Every structure is written in C-alpha cells, then in structure tokens.
From Swiss-Prot:
The mature envelope protein (Env) consists of a trimer of SU-TM heterodimers attached by noncovalent interactions or by a labile interchain disulfide bond. The gene is env. The 17 amino acids long immunosuppressive region is present in many retroviral envelope proteins. Synthetic peptides derived from this relatively conserved sequence inhibit immune function in vitro and in vivo. It comes from Avian retrovirus RPL30. The chain crosses the membrane at residues 230-250. This is Envelope glycoprotein. This protein is synthesized as a Env-Ryk chimeric protein and then cellular protease cleaves this precursor into gp85 and the putative oncogene termed gp69 (gp37-Ryk). The sequence shown here corresponds to the Env (gp85-gp37) homolog fragment of the chimera. Residues 251-257 are cytoplasmic. The record marks 78-79 as: Cleavage.
C-alpha cells in the first residue's frame, strides 16, 4: 500500500501487504512510533519517511533556547539604544590644572568635556564586558569538549578492562571518578553580565521617554502629538518673552533715526 506524507494509517481497515525493508538510516515515523521498515499493520499518524537523531543538549544550549524564546514578544517602551562597537572608547581625562581653569573660565566647556568622557567610559566598560563574556564563553566551550573527551576515554578504558577480565579494583584510583559540571552556574553568571551590560544605553528621545513615564502605556501617535504640542508651547513662550524686547528695540531705533 502507498504511504503518503502526513496521512493517518488505520490497520483495522484495508488490505495490507508483507513488511517492506527501508534503506539504512531511513525510518517510517507514524506519530510517536518509528519503524526501520514498513510493517504490515502500521498504526498512528501522521506518517512520514525520515531520519532519527539523538538530541542531547547541554546546559548552555538549553539556556540559549530559553533566552531566545523569552525575548519574543517583548515590547520596549523607552527609546534607549545600546552602545555598539563603533562608539569611541578613547578616554582622555583632564589634569588638575586644566580642570581648574575650565571650571573658572568656561564652566560649559568643562561640563561638556565631563559628559563626553563619561560616554567614552561607558563605551569602554561595555566593550570590556563583551570581550570578557566572549572569552569566558570560548573557555567554557573548550572545557565542555574536554569533559566530553574525558568521558569517552573513561568509557573506553572501562570497556577494555572488562574485555580482558579485569575490574576497577585491579587498578588503584579507577573505581572513584568524579567530573564536576558547573556549566549551569557559569551560564547564569553570563546572563547576569549581559544584563548589566544592557543597563548602559543612550536615551535618543528623552522627551518621549519622559512622556511615556508620565502618562503610562499610551500609543506612539499620542507621544508625537504631545511632543508637537510641547514644541508649539515652547515657541509661543519664546515669542511672548522675546517679542516685547524686539518691539522695544525697533521702536528705539526708529526714534533715533
């Protein structure tokens, strides 16, 4: 009988032929059952022809899958962008003499210099944290591969001992074997480091962030409307403040003429 992809098979109906063999590594999969050939009375569905493999993820892979699944559907209300690799991390601090003269003669320049150096320090911290996390991740991968190789070697040694009729008691120290696994704790610390790095960001829209925090979960169209109203209000206030001075200046100029 023909096996169509995705069909359900009912062995209580129809005529069935003899079991058929499938090529190596090919299985008939019907629901939660799998056969290395086509049986005379398969049950279940949907049925497919495919290959089977063993899934044995470690703690690192499981945490990556959970992290990717938890990030879906997350809404960001604040317009805070994270620092990228293109930011400048060249920190050049002023000496005491330059700070004193700048504070006395040009306070605005001193404040701008301080803000710029703070931004560069934040960029330097983010890059260092990213490098540290990447380095520790590579070391964890190496340790995981070494652990896997050690377990394979131990299994081969046990097999050879049993094949020659010996046990672990014949060789000192072979009966006790403890290989600790701290990958789960290390992965948690990696996640904490990434969370701390993500706390450093640049607020590209402070007015919008302030309005979102003031009015709660309002829509973006309302944010743009409120920003337009605030801009119009600021322009009106500037006109109210500056227009009398401008009119007075024009009138005094005309009188002198």
């Amino acid at each position: 009988f023909p096996i169509l992809p995705g069909v359900w098979v009912d062995s209580t109906q129809g005529n069935f032929t003899k079991p058929k063999a499938l090529p190596p590594a090919i299985f008939l999969i019907c629901g939660d059952r799998a056969w290395q050939g086509i049986p005379s009375r398969p049950v279940g569905g949907p049925c497919y022809l495919g290959k089977l493999t063993m899934l044995a993820p470690n703690h690192t892979d499981i945490h990556k899958i959970l992290a990717n699944s938890s990030q879906t559907g997350v809404r960001h209300f604040r317009s805070v962008s994270h620092l990228d690799d293109t930011c400048s991390d060249e920190v050049q601090l002023w000496g005491p003499t330059a700070r004193i003269f700048a504070s006395i003669l040009a306070p605005g320049v001193a404040a701008a210099q301080a803000l710029r150096e703070i931004e560069r320090l934040a960029c330097w911290s983010v890059k260092q944290a990213n490098l540290t996390t990447s380095l520790l991740g590579d070391l964890l991968d190496d340790v995981t591969s070494i652990r896997h190789a050690v377990l394979q070697n131990r299994a081969a040694i046990d097999f050879l001992l049993l094949a020659h009729g010996h046990g672990c008691k014949d060789i000192a120290g072979m009966c006790c074997f403890n290989l600790s696994d701290h990958s789960e704790a290390i992965q948690k610390k990696f996640q904490l480091m990434k969370e701390h790095v993500n706390k450093i960001g640049v607020d590209s829209d402070p007015i919008g962030s302030w309005l979102r925090g003031l009015f709660g979960g309002i829509g973006e169209w309302a944010i743009h409307l409120l920003k337009g109203l605030l801009l119009g209000l600021v322009v009106i206030l500037l006109l109210v403040v500056c227009l009398p001075c401008l009119l007075q200046f024009v009138s005094s100029s005309t009188r002198k003429m």
